[in-house]
Amino acid sequence: MILPLIASLLLAVSVITDPSPIEIPADPLATLRTQHPRIMANVDDFARLKETLKTDPQASKMAQAVIRQADASLNKPLPMHILPDGKRLLSISRDVKNRIQALGLAWQLTGDKKYPDGAWRILQAAGNFPDWNPPHFLDTAEMTRAFAVGLDWMNEAWTTDQKEQICQWIIKRGLDPAMAGYKDPASKNGHQLRARHNWGQVCDSGIGMGALAIADMHPDEAREALRFALQCIQPSLSHYAPDGGWAEGYGYYGYAMEYTSGFLSSLDRSLGTDFGLSKIPGFSFSPDFPTYLEGPCGNYFGFADCGEREHKVSSLPWAGWAAMQFQNPASAQNQRKKAETYPDAIGLLWLPPAMDQSKISPSSRVKQFSKIGCATLRTKWGDTNAGFVGFKAGDNKVNHSHLDIGSFVYDVEGQHWAVDLGADNYNLPDYFGKKRWDYYRLRAEGNNTLVANPGPAPDQSTKADCPLTLCTDRGDAGLAIGDLSAAYPSLTSAKRGMHLANNGSLRIQDELDSGGKEATIFWFMHTPAKIEISQDGQSATLLQKGKTLRADLISPTNARFEKMEAVPLPTSPNPPGQMVNKGVTKLVVRSDFKHKETIVVDLTPEGGELAPLSVTPLSAW
C-alpha cells in the first residue's frame, strides 16, 4: 500500500539534519510521464535535434563526431571491475557513461540496432560487477547515471527482460547502497550523499537520475530514493549564492554542474518540475562563473585543486543547458564556440543555437564572486591580447582548497604570464589529510602570493577566510583589494590590491604591518617565461614566445628581484613523489622589515606606458 510507505519515507527523511529550504512532496512521482525517453531529453527534444542537424552545420559536424565515437566504442574492450589506483572505480564509471551516452544518441539519430546491441554488452559487463565501489560513492553515482541513460535513451530497443535486468542493476548496485547511506547519516556513504560540496551534487544527482529512469517499472524504490536525493542535494546547491561562484574552483564547479544539470533536466522531462531547485538563490547566476574565470589566452583561473586547462578547456555541455535555462546568451555562445572542438553527446544535445554576436550585450569587465572572495578584471572582451587578472582571497577551509589566499594569474598580449600550478597527485600520502600542507603546490609558496616568516608549518592559516573589500571598474582601470590579514597570523595586517590599467599593465600592491616585530616576506609569481633580472635588481624582463613583459619593483627601494626554481624553500617540507614543475620559474621579492612595509610591483607589456612611480595607498584606490 502507498500510504504506509509514504509515512515511512517521511519518518526516514526526518533524520536528515541539513536545513532544507524546499519542501518535497510526499509522492514526488505523482506527475510522472511514463513515456521514454525522459532522462535529460524527451522525444520532442530528439526530434528537434534531428531538425537542427539539417540547418546547423556545426551541429551536423558534431553529430558525425558523436557517431564516430559510438562506432569506436563498439570495438573497445568491455569494462572490467578494476580500481587502477586501489581506491577508485571512477575512470571505469566515466568510460561506461561516455560510451553509453554516445551509443544512446547514435541510436536516437540513426535507429541503427548495432548501437543498443553494443550498449547491452557494456551494460551487461558493468552490471555484473560485484559492486560499483560504494565506499567511493562518486563511482557508484556516475555508473548509476550511465545505466539510467542506457535504460532510457534506448528503451524502445530493449526487450522486457532486458529492461527489467537494467532496472535491477540500477537498484542493487546504485539505489540500494544509496538508501543505506541516506538512512544512516553517520555512515561514510551518509556523509558523501549529504556533502555540501561537489560530492553532494554528483552523488544525489546520479541516484536521482537512476530513480527517475526506473520510476515506471519500480515506483516504490524510485520514490524513496528520489525523495532523499531531492532533500540531500539542497545544502550543496545553496553554496552558489549569492552570485553563482563556486569555492572549490572551476574544475569541481564543472563536475558538480555536469550532474546537477543532468538531474534537474531529467526532473523537468520526467515530472514537469524540478521542485524549485533551479530557483535556489545564486544558482541562476552559475553560468557566469566559467565565462568570467576564463582568460583571453584560454586558460581558466585554476585556484584550488583545479588545472588552468581543466578538461582541455573543452566543451562544457551542461553550460548549454544552464545558459538556455537561465537566458544567459554570453555563456551560451561561449559554450557553442567550445563544443565543436571537443564534441560529445551531451554537448550536442544541449548545443545552444547560433546567435548574432552584435545582439549579445557586452559583459562587465570586472566581476566579483563575493562569497568565495574571487574577482576577475579584464581590459576588454573578444580580444586574445587583452589584459586579464584572476585574483582571490577566500576560505582556506573549503573542500579542495589550497593555501592560496592572495594568489593571482595574469594574461596580456596573448601570453599567460602568471600561472597557477594546480593540484598534485591525489594519491600522494595523506593528500587530503594531515600531510596536505606539506605539498608544494598546495602551500602559499607554490602559488602567486605572499609567504610570511617561512618555516615547516603551513605557510598560511588553514582556517583563514578573507574577504574582498573592493572590486570595481573605475573606467581607466579595474581594481580589486583583498584583506589577507587572517591568512598571516604572524602579521597584524596584510592587504593586497590589483590594479589592471586599460593598456593591460598590472600593479600588485601589498601593505603589510608586522606590529613592531621583525618579519621576512617572500613575494612569489610563477611564470613559464624566461626571466632576466637587471643589474640593480630593480627591474626584470620576462620573455615568452616572442613577447616581452617588464617588471618594475617600485617599493621597497632596498629590495631586489630574484628568480628561483618552483621548488620548496629550504625551510619547507619536501615529501617525495610530488610533481615536477617543469618549465616554470618564480619571480621573487624578499623583504625584511619591522613595523610596516609596502611592496609594489608593476608589470607592463612591451610598448606599454610605465605606471607612475608614486604609490597611492590602497585606502585611496
Over which residues does each language-model region extend?
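Sec-dependent signal peptide recognition
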Residues: 1-8
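Low-complexity, Ser/Thr/Pro/Gly-enriched N-terminal "stalk/linker" regions
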Residues: 15-84
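Well-ordered alpha-helical scaffold segments within catalytic/enzyme domains
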Residues: 35-55, 97-113, 125-133, 143-161, ...
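Solvent-exposed loop and edge beta-strand segments that line ligand/cofactor-binding
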Residues: 38, 78-96, 128-141, 179-202, ...
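Active-site lining segments of carbohydrate-active enzymes
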Residues: 83-87, 148-251, 347-364
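Carbohydrate-active enzyme catalytic cores, enriched for enzymes
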Residues: 187, 214, 252-417, 472-482, ...
